A protein has these predicted regions:
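Residues on the lipid-exposed face of transmembrane beta-strands in outer-membrane beta-barrel proteins
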Residues: 1-3, 14-20, 32, 62-66, ...
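Structural signature of outer-membrane beta-barrel domains
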Residues: 4-8, 21, 33-39, 71, ...
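Residues that define the transmembrane beta-barrel architecture of outer-membrane proteins
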Residues: 8-12, 54-60, 109-115, 161-165
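Repeated loop/turn-to-beta-strand initiation elements of outer-membrane beta-barrel proteins
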Residues: 9, 22-28, 70-74, 84, ...
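Surface-exposed loop/turn segments flanking beta-strands in extracellular/periplasmic regions
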Residues: 23-24, 88-104
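Outer-membrane beta-barrel architecture
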Residues: 25-29, 71-75, 112-116, 136-145, ...
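C-terminal outer-membrane beta-barrel translocator/porin domains of Gram-negative envelope proteins
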Residues: 27-37, 41-53, 105, 147-201
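Outer-membrane beta-barrel transmembrane strands
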Residues: 47-86, 109, 128-137
């Protein structure tokens, strides 16, 4: 948690995690928080820190994950987020002056309810089976993930409506005395764009 004296506001995140079946790595987690989001995560450095690229978001989320067989996992997540513009939020004056046209974007506050389901698979995942738990060691193969997400309109004030499919490949590997490295390759797209806000792209 952190508190901003200039704007007298509190930001932060709170989460809880419960591993209810250690042998199948089955878990549930809950989270909530208030922080800043980016309108465009892929903006240039000059634009990504511009006031117009920020918005305020408050969220609650619930996630379930379990292993169906060795290396193959399924997961589901539900998240509700309210998004609003910065309004009269004050930045440090010296920070503001470093950017041109540094005015916050104005838009109506909105709610987003999004449900996601997905699977991931790591071939030949190595593990140790203890009497009461399974300990994953790793694999020399990458992890393949496929996730489907849908924004649900008309639920808990949500007006957004879109569908999205994402596929990714991720792998961590050792590089000797340099420690560990990692790469991720991802692709995806919208299956439906009935109602999107700019930060949903």
């Amino acid at each position: 948690l952190n508190y901003g004296f200039r704007n007298q506001d509190m930001k932060g995140n709170l989460s809880g995690y419960y591993l209810y079946n250690p042998k199948k790595l089955s878990s549930v987690s809950l989270g909530m928080g208030s922080d800043f989001g980016f309108v465009n995560n892929f903006a240039t450095f000059a634009d990504i820190l511009n006031r117009s690229n920020f918005f305020v978001q408050k969220y609650v989320t619930a996630t379930h994950r379990t292993e169906l067989f060795n290396g193959f996992y399924s997961g589901a997540n539900v998240r509700r987020t309210t998004r609003s513009d910065l309004g009269d939020f004050e930045f440090n004056p010296s920070f503001d002056s470093a950017f041109s046209n540094n005015n916050p974007q104005r838009f109506k506050s909105s709610a987003l309810v999004i449900a996601s389901v997905g699977i991931s698979y790591t071939p030949k995942q190595l593990y140790i089976q203890e009497p009461k738990e399974k300990i994953v060691i790793g694999s020399k193969f990458p992890t393949f993930q496929l996730y489907y997400s849908q924004a649900i309109a008309g639920v808990l004030g949500s007006k957004a409506s879109f569908k999205e499919l994402d596929f990714s490949i991720n792998q961590k590997f050792n590089v000797g005395i340099f420690g560990q490295s990692e790469y991720t390759v991802s692709l995806g797209g919208f299956l439906d764009t009935s109602k999107l806000q700019i930060m949903d792209y």
